[in-house]
């Protein structure tokens, strides 16, 4: 993993200047920075994000020594987990660290899924784009599970977008390496509304814990409703959506984009039934991410069956051209190669 000079990173964010601050979390601050490095005969530049424990920032409220230690441990854990993973197009790319106090990751200019669905005044993404986002995140979590990592904090705020509006899973502060013989079981943690209600004891942690959280995100994507909305009754998206799914009232769930009608109705019903399985109180009945990704791929193909042959072919050609426009660009840092999509 690449190690950066601590002082150079601090200088790049103007010594934790508020003008460079782009995000705050419960355990850390995120700053935007422009880094330079010498590559053969030229100096290359890259915009990155630098994450710090909030205790390092002069503008952060004073906190106890135990709180500072907890923040530092979470960042160190995030660095350890992310540095152990190979590249995946829908997992935020780790670029390096400085003394395990500052973490450098790729910069994501288009904010989060939460912002897109619940805050932005721009039109919602199309129905198919929203389901494509759901597939991208499912593939990311499937990748993590194949490498023995349980994320433990899957939520719309931790799904970020790059310049091409490709979704990437971020924030590995609570992630656990569950691979091999490690089987680390920390105390339950996560975000209310996304946290698996069956995860009440350390020994209850499993890959299905992430499945529940993903199911909440999938309901959020389909309905455009928040995971917890105290202005509504019931406040929980799960308590609201699951009874409607069981009754087949999908038109009352799908938010924007025509997901509940026309050629998308069959797709919507399949997705919502799968979401209901993800958030089931019967942990063993929840699907694994291999099954989830396969089902979403099948759902995305469903509307094409209803189209005339020439439209299906045209759609595939257009999609192929769009993919070619997003050919991978390789950026080489000293000691590391990182592809940006």
UniProtKB/Swiss-Prot annotation:
Catalytic machinery residues: 153
Entry-linked PROSITE patterns: PROTEIN_KINASE_ATP (PS00107), PROTEIN_KINASE_DOM (PS50011), PROTEIN_KINASE_ST (PS00108)
UniProt feature, compositional bias: Low complexity: 53-69
Gene Ontology terms for molecular function: ATP binding; protein serine kinase activity; protein serine/threonine kinase activity
Recorded coiled-coil stretches: 311-332
Region (Disordered): 52-75
Note: This gene is linked with a growth rate QTL (quantitative trait locus).
Record-given protein name: Serine/threonine-protein kinase-like protein At5g23170
Organism: Arabidopsis thaliana
Organism lineage string: Eukaryota, Viridiplantae, Streptophyta, Embryophyta, Tracheophyta
